[in-house]
Structure formats: C-alpha cells, structure tokens
Swiss-Prot record:
GO biological process assignments: methylation
Entry's EC annotation: 2.1.1.144
Keyword Cytoplasm: yes
Source organism of this protein record: Escherichia coli O6:K15:H31 (strain 536 / UPEC)
Domain of life: Bacteria
GO MF terms, alphabetically ordered: trans-aconitate 2-methyltransferase activity
Protein name, per record: Trans-aconitate 2-methyltransferase
Entry keyword annotation includes Thylakoid: no
Gene name, Swiss-Prot/TrEMBL: tam
Catalysed reactions, semicolon-separated: trans-aconitate + S-adenosyl-L-methionine = (E)-3-(methoxycarbonyl)pent-2-enedioate + S-adenosyl-L-homocysteine
Family: Belongs to the methyltransferase superfamily. Tam family.
C-alpha cells in the first residue's frame, strides 16, 4: 500500500465529491485566472473547478503518482504536478487555492496556512475542507486496534480546531468564513465502512504491515465496528462523518 489507489478512492466518488461541491459554492469569486487544487487526487475536485472557471489556468498538485496519472487521463486540458504541497511554489500569485480533504494529512498548520495565504493574489481565496473525524469511532478504533496488536501509532494528528483556524487566518490577513457539517452516509455493511476508510484513513496503519498482519488488523477492526455501529431498521448503517470548512479571503 505504498501509493494511493484511485479506483478504491473513487468507489465512493459521489460521497467524496459532495463536500467539494458545497465548499465551491461558498467561494466568492467570479472571473479568475490562476487556480491550484492542492491534493487533487484523481481529479474529481479539479473537474468541478474546471466546470466553474473553464477559462482559468488550473494546476492540480498531489504527491501520489497513481492519483496524478488518473487525473491527467481524466482532464487532459488541466496541468497536474506530482509534488509535496508544502514545497510546491506557483509561478504566479493564485486567485484561488482549493484544498478538499488534503491538508489534514500535513503537520504544522500554524505555519502551513499562513504560507498558503502568502501564495494568494490580493483578494484571493483559500478554500479548505478537512475531515474532522479524529474522535469518531472509525478513527478511535484504528488507534485501539493498533494498540491491542502492538503496532505504532501512524494516524494523523487531530485538527487544530475552529477557533485556532480562525485566529491563524485572521492574523494572516484574511476575512474568514468557517463552519462544520456532519454528513450521515448510508452504508450497506460494516465491510463498506472498511472499504471507505481503507482508501484514506486506514492507509497509514496498513501500509507497513504484511498481508497476514493486515488481515489480522482488519478482522479485529471489523469486529469493533460491529459493536459501535448498529444496523438501522432497514439494515443500513449510518456513518457520521464531520467535516470542517474554511473560506478565507485575503484582504490585502
């Protein structure tokens, strides 16, 4: 599991794209020229940007070769670059930096967010959506299984929090719109929950395990999910998925 799996990621494409659509709807920009899609993945968020601003120059950034290859195949008219978000430098100031479900993987948000604001043009916008599910059973159980089986903690850090992000971006010279939404995804089985998180949140936990260790981990994880997520009357499971949204507009 050394690289991301675009096919597995896109298995829940509609659910993963919905937050991007809702984030994009709150971006207060009309005619713009330069856009960066940070953590573009297979290009599903980039396609939304291209639909809204077809004349803009859009660059998708991702560290995964597999994701970049998939995005290039899907959107040949857009530019895609394999790079680390923290080190990538645009050739010109950006009117919009769009980051849908990517920045949560990176550390040091107190430094990262002001850095991203510095890449914006005057009145440019930083639009961010991050899963805020560190305390949800899906992610708590990952840590518990790893502890039970004596594996090191490889999960991401929790988000800084609403008040912290507001202060970080206000001090960086932005007007800030911030909100949190909890989605309730209808899942047909506990295995479907595993399929969902295997493409994202479970990757760090599984990537260095042998095949037998992965199976042992997932078997125990499945058992614990059954205890935490009861079936609805119709047999479905409601998977709560909180997400944090930020639209920060540079005032300088």
């Amino acid at each position: 599991m050394s690289d991301w799996n675009p096919s597995l990621y896109l298995h829940f494409a509609a659910e993963r794209s919905r937050p991007a659509v809702e984030l994009l709807a709150r971006v207060p920009l009309e005619n713009i020229e330069y856009i960066a899609d940070l953590g573009c993945g297979p290009g599903n968020s980039t396609a939304l940007l291209d639909q809204r601003w077809p004349a803009a120059r859009i660059t998708g950034i991702d560290s995964s070769p597999a994701m970049i290859a998939e995005a290039r195949s899907a959107l040949p008219d857009c530019l895609f670059v394999e790079a680390d978000i923290r080190n990538w430098q645009p050739e010109q100031a950006l009117d919009l930096i769009f980051a849908n479900a990517s920045l949560q993987w990176l550390p040091d948000h107190y430094e990262l967010f002001p850095h991203l604001v510095s890449l914006l043009s005057p009145l440019g916008v930083l639009a961010v959506q991050m899963p805020d599910n560190w305390l949800e059973p899906t992610h708590v159980l990952m840590r518990e299984v790893a502890w039970e089986q004596n594996y090191p903690d490889r999960g991401r850090e929790p988000l800084a929090g609403v008040h912290a992000y507001y202060d970080i971006l206000s001090e960086a010279g932005c007007e800030v719109d911030i909100w949190r939404t909890t989605y309730y995804h209808q899942m047909p089985s506990h295995q479907a929950i595993i399929d969902w998180v295997t493409a994202t949140g479970l990757r760090p936990w599984l990537q260095d395990l042998t095949e037998s260790e992965q199976q042992h981990f997932l078997t125990r994880y499945h058992q614990m999910l059954e205890e935490q997520y009861p079936l609805q009357e119709n047999g479905q499971i409601l998977l709560a998925f909180p997400r944090l949204f930020i639209v920060a507009r540079r005032t300088e």
